Amino acid sequence: MLKGFTVPKSPFGQAALTPPPPWHYSSDVVGVEFWTDPDAAAATLPRGLLPDPKSNGHAVMMFLDWQFTAQDDEYLDPARYQYREALILVDAMYLDVPVMWCPYIYVDNDAALACGWTRGFPKKIGRIFQTRSFAASGPAAAPVAKHACNR
């Protein structure tokens, strides 16, 4: 009998894209709040959700640098358990409750893709990069801030 939490199944279950839960996560995150055309935001909503009339197209874009683990084996295969993710959240209403709906998520790791699919997230494979700086200054280290605040 073939085994595994996700596909591909194998005799010992080791070929699966992701191990079974529970999964534990840690990340760095950058979020950008923005307002878009309310009709464009409404076009992403599935049946059962309505636009939030108070939000006027409010949305959030998040960029995450994740590490996750299931059976404490991330140190054996760090590439399997580290990934980047970018997602969009738009304001909506479910019945009379304000919620945020996630129409798009991009990840750069197939294990993260499979974990998301098992929980109903609309993940797709993509490439996600963030500008970063380094402690050692130089032309390749992007400045964190160009100018100090003058008071």
PLM region spans:
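Hydrophobic, proline/glycine-rich low-complexity stretches
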Residues: 1-72, 80-82
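A generic structural signal for solvent-exposed, polar alpha-helical segments
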Residues: 11, 18, 29, 89, ...
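Extended, compositionally biased
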Residues: 58-101, 105-107
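Surface-exposed beta-strand edges and their flanking turn/coil or helix-capping segments
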Residues: 45-47, 74-76, 114-120
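Internal, well-folded beta-alpha domain core
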Residues: 97-151
